[in-house]
Amino acid sequence: MSQTAKVLLLYAHPESQDSVANRVLLKPAQQLSNVTVHDLYAHYPDFFIDIPREQELLRQHDVIVFQHPLYTYSCPALLKEWLDRVLSRGFSSGPGGNQLAGKYWRSVITTGEPESAYRHDSLNRYPMSDILRPFELTAAMCRMHWMSPMIVYWARRQQPQALASHAKAYGEWLASPIPTGGH
């Protein structure tokens, strides 16, 4: 891709005002001209999703980033509703459902536990790669390229310098999200 990829950052946090980590991560994204930050809870507080509008946003972008906290081994309720309604059969899957084919999917996740909690012998009993498998499968169903997720573990307990480092790396990636040679 010779021009800068257009990124749609779907942000889903029901208590965004209380999430220091997510606010810090969003700052570089909000300063980049190739990134559209779309706060789902701000747009749809009543959960009535404008499906045609959302599908058009997806069509207009090359890379779709799903930024959210890990809630009960998944995503917040509004994002789950969004996934179920917007990524509909005939649009992104099934016969004729090729609107997202070839686009890129990246999950950017914040957690309340340390990385060590995501092991077979630890608190959550499964590694993050297993927990995120439904998202990876959804990307495959949509014929999208799954990109390695960015995970900020123990987000609430991150020191400001560590959060700033994550935000800097995230911003640099958002500025040029598609690796040379495709995926």
Swiss-Prot record:
Recorded topology in the membrane: Peripheral membrane protein
Entry-linked SUPFAM superfamilies: Flavoproteins (SSF52218)
Listed EC numbers:
1.6.5.2
Question: Catalytic activity, per the record?
Answer: a quinone + NADH + H(+) = a quinol + NAD(+); a quinone + NADPH + H(+) = a quinol + NADP(+)
- Family, per the entry? Belongs to the NAD(P)H dehydrogenase (quinone) family. KefG subfamily.
Write down the species.
Enterobacter sp. (strain 638)
Give this protein's Gene Ontology molecular function annotations: electron transfer activity; FMN binding; NADH:ubiquinone reductase (non-electrogenic) activity; NADPH dehydrogenase (quinone) activity
Domain of life, source organism:
Bacteria
A single GO BP annotation from the record? potassium ion transport
Protein's name in the database? Glutathione-regulated potassium-efflux system ancillary protein KefG
Q: Its principal location? A: membrane
Function, as annotated:
Regulatory subunit of a potassium efflux system that confers protection against electrophiles. Required for full activity of KefB.
Keyword vocabulary terms for this entry: Cell inner membrane, Cell membrane, Membrane, NAD, Oxidoreductase
According to the entry, what is the taxonomic lineage of the organism?
Answer: Bacteria, Pseudomonadati, Pseudomonadota, Gammaproteobacteria, Enterobacterales
Assembly behavior = Interacts with KefB.
Q: Does the keyword Protease apply?
A: no
- What Pfam families does its record include? Flavodoxin_2
